[in-house]
């Protein structure tokens, strides 16, 4: 990704301590662009409500940290996704206090596809790890992207189950993406980069800090249609994620466990508070599939307005697009890249259409990122 003037401006803001979404919203209402904000004097920015430290950091950023971020962005797989970027996930934008910039390693398109968060205890039981893996496999095979926080225990089990099937998974981190925390998950993080995405609101060079992880948890829930808590003690950080999900109007699911297990007490509390008790991935799919399909169709209808013929109904244009995609698939396994070449659509368009077809039971996903039509081949 190039470090254009606008991107450089966003980096100035991302590196400024104490600049939150609310303050940036006020600034954008007063100035025409990020570049114009960065060209103001410190006193002008302070009149807009910023502290002296934040204002000075915007107009005169730390040269070393800025250079580090710019070098990081020269890698093809590294991205800076800002509020006004086409790839900024709309579901996260809907959430309160969403970060104004995301650093991403891997495929940023995944952030806008339907996701389910799977979270839980770092000190998970063997049964908890097995359960997280089982749910992650079933949910990813049903077309959802599994999102978690790259922590040990439940998070790692959910990510690993997806990676082992070559399914996409999103890991939200509480550090800069030039480092992995915990270090034990370096190999897992490298695998996620290849088939999914690593995400952080923190720029390169930022070390782990206890205050970062609640912010990470808010992004996890904000990206997701729902949050599943597999195992959690009464003070588990997973309960923070579930709390954010509820605040954001998202679904909260919890798996019950033994009344004698400390790692079940958090889930039992959530269920008492109204979380949906689930025993199988099908319970979640039944609840979230209609939302996933509706959001994807809404996204597609917005883009389709620009491409469809005059006076042709949007629904008709969308249906024609699906018919074209199914015809291009044929009856043999095919990859997303193969369909992009056959249809002339973007990878994002093909991916979202495939997800809808999968949720509707018309196609199935196979190993190696391939898809195939279900049913009987027409003669």
Residue ranges and their predicted role:
Residues 2-6, 82-379:
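Glycine-biased, small-residue-rich flexible motifs in mid-sequence functional cores and linkers
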